[in-house]
Amino acid sequence: MSIFRFSQREIIDLTISVLAIAFIFSYPNFSILVFIISLIAVGSGFIFHELMHRTVARKYGAWSEFRAWYEGLILGFILKLVFGATFIAPGAVYIYKDYLTPEENGKIALAGPLTNVALAFVFFILMLIFKPGSLLYWIGIFGFHINLFLAGFNMLPIPPFDGEKVLKWNPFIWAIVGLPLIGYMLYMMFW
């Protein structure tokens, strides 16, 4: 299955999920500008994270496709609107193959958080290039922090997160990738 082939349902699910996530991250200070910053910074992190899982799974001969979890999106809206809490559980890439080795499963899982790290680097470059206070500078700051946060969150070593699959496959790789990212995530949460 080609990595560039998307079903109509997958396109709809990805679109609805990314718009919902952008809204959740832009509320309560919602404006078109804040929404656009959120869409670029958070939306790109979410989309590329999920599509990298999908791409690596297809490399291993598995059928894979993103499916939205509409209940999770609704819960995210309710928690944000009622309590001001940010919760995102937009869906996941569903993977089907008769058998995936622990190594294949671990590499599929690791692909998402590593993509967020790569995106964080790109956003960091934006922060360095553009003048503080400019739109691209703010996109850079938000994109840098949120992508490292997403990578750390996904590397938690508990099901259903990516970190659990990586740890089962290779504890050393989980430690050198996951621990710094989880540390950064915790720093962001409590600093």
Curated annotation (Swiss-Prot):
Active-site residues, Swiss-Prot/TrEMBL: E50
Entry's Gene Ontology molecular function annotations: metal ion binding; metallopeptidase activity
BP GO annotations: proteolysis
Major site of localization recorded for this protein: membrane
Record-level GO cellular component terms: plasma membrane
Signal peptide positions on this chain: none
Transmembrane portions of the chain: 20-40, 73-93, 110-130, 133-153, 171-191
Enzyme class: hydrolase
Record: residues binding Zn(2+): H49, H53
Membrane topology: Multi-pass membrane protein
Location(s), subcellular: Cell membrane
Pfam families with a match to the protein in the record: Peptidase_M50
Protein name per Swiss-Prot or TrEMBL: Putative zinc metalloprotease MJ0611
Organism: Methanocaldococcus jannaschii (strain ATCC 43067 / DSM 2661 / JAL-1 / JCM 10045 / NBRC 100440)
